[in-house]
Design a protein with these regions (language model features):
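N-terminal secretory signal peptides and thylakoid transit peptides that target proteins
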Residues: 1-18
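C-terminal segment of N-terminal export signals and the immediately downstream linker at the start
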Residues: 25-59
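Conserved, mostly hydrophobic/aromatic
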Residues: 60, 196, 267
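Active-site-adjacent beta->alpha loops and helix N-cap segments on the catalytic face
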Residues: 113-127, 147-148, 171-185, 253-254, ...
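Glycine/proline-rich, positively charged
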Residues: 141-217, 248, 263
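Glycine-rich phosphate-binding active-site loops on the catalytic face of alpha/beta enzymes
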Residues: 169, 223-225, 290-304
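Catalytic alpha/beta core domains of metabolic enzymes, predominantly
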Residues: 199-284
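C-terminal helical cap(s) of enzyme catalytic domains, especially alpha/beta-barrels
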Residues: 303-325
């Protein structure tokens, strides 16, 4: 525990020293110097709210800790991720998030993409019970047509404050005209006191849910620009599905931005860095300027403080200048 506490003290001092500073783009910059211990340790992370739950505008994503990094054709990366993110490293990362004002993480309920080794629930329980961790958990769930509630119930039983339907499931059910299944899943989530959401990679999902008047608390929709070298050219993008090379998750950013300007529900944008292909300064700015209320970002421990500072500075600037879509508080 001493190692974590020493890091906690360092983070408090360095965050105080960083107040008012803006980081240049990228994660590969040197750490800011630690300031005097007597300085204020408060980090003013912008906050929002989804129904009754207060949530930091930057949310810690969960793909990295299960080894799901969308590594394209780099076959060693998933194993590297799983070896890096030991239980203690996950705990350390969440603790750093709390130090930096990030009060919420998103993580799966026994993800089928975790190679049978999803640590999320086990480590979250350890973090809360053994370390006194207070980070909130919004659970990514995997309802099935023959079992809508089992995965959701596991999230409820393990202390989640919210739950949403996995994006691939949301895409598939809307494509197959099963909005009714999504509505039933949301109803079960809300009945148990959690905030309910739907994730998706296709803008057709929130369009269909809004048209049907489905009672959902928030949307999780991908948003990133196509200004990176491995993005699929527009002429080659499928009309409805994602490109086949695991390299792009928002094929219609302009349409997504335009649609959400007319949506009054909170929007958590994810894949805002195109799974590591876009610099944080650029990706965060694109997401928040274009209407996202929250950003879900997978982070290594050494990226947390940089991303927190970038988020704070970009949102402060946007709130001074304004943006076309109002913030959903």
């Amino acid at each position: 525990m001493a190692g974590f506490l020493n890091r906690r003290g360092f983070i408090k001092r360095s965050l105080a020293a960083s107040a008012g500073l803006t980081l240049p783009a990228g994660h590969n910059k040197p750490a800011l110097a630690a300031g005097p211990a007597e300085q204020s340790t408060n980090f003013d992370m912008p906050m929002g709210k989804i129904r009754h739950v207060g949530i930091s505008r930057l949310i810690c994503g969960g793909n990295l800790i299960i080894g799901s990094a969308h590594e394209r054709d780099l076959i060693y990366v998933a194993s590297l991720m799983r070896h890096y993110f030991t239980d203690n490293k996950i705990i350390e990362t969440w603790q750093l998030c709390e130090e930096c004002g990030i009060n919420t993480m998103i993580g799966p309920v026994n993800s089928p993409y975790a190679f049978g080794e999803d640590p999320t629930i086990r480590v979250y329980n350890r973090y809360c019970k053994e370390w006194g961790g207070q980070i909130q958990w919004i659970a990514q769930t995997y309802p099935k047509t023959y079992d809508l509630t089992g995965s959701i119930q596991m999230a409820i039983d393990n202390g989640a404050v919210g739950a949403f339907v996995h994006g691939g499931i949301g895409d598939n059910w809307v494509r197959n005209n099963r909005v009714d299944l999504l509505a039933k899943a949301f109803e079960f989530i809300k009945k148990n006191g959690l905030i309910a959401g739907c994730a998706c990679h296709s803008i057709e999902v929130p369009i269909a849910l809004e048209k049907a008047g489905v009672d959902v608390d928030f949307y999780m929709n991908t948003l990133h620009s196509d200004d990176y070298w491995s993005a699929t050219p527009k002429a080659e993008r499928p009309e409805h599905d994602l490109p086949p090379h695991d390299n792009m998750w928002c094929t219609k950013p302009e349409q997504t931005i335009e649609f959400f300007r007319g949506v009054s529900k909170p929007w958590i944008a994810f894949k805002i860095l195109a799974a590591g292909a876009i610099q944080p300064q650029k990706g965060f700015k694109f997401a928040f300027e274009n209407g996202a209320d929250f950003a879900n970002v997978g982070m290594f421990d050494f990226q947390v403080r940089h991303d927190a500072i970038i988020t704070r500075d970009i949102i402060d600037e946007i709130k001074r200048k304004g943006r076309p879509r109002p913030w959903m508080e």
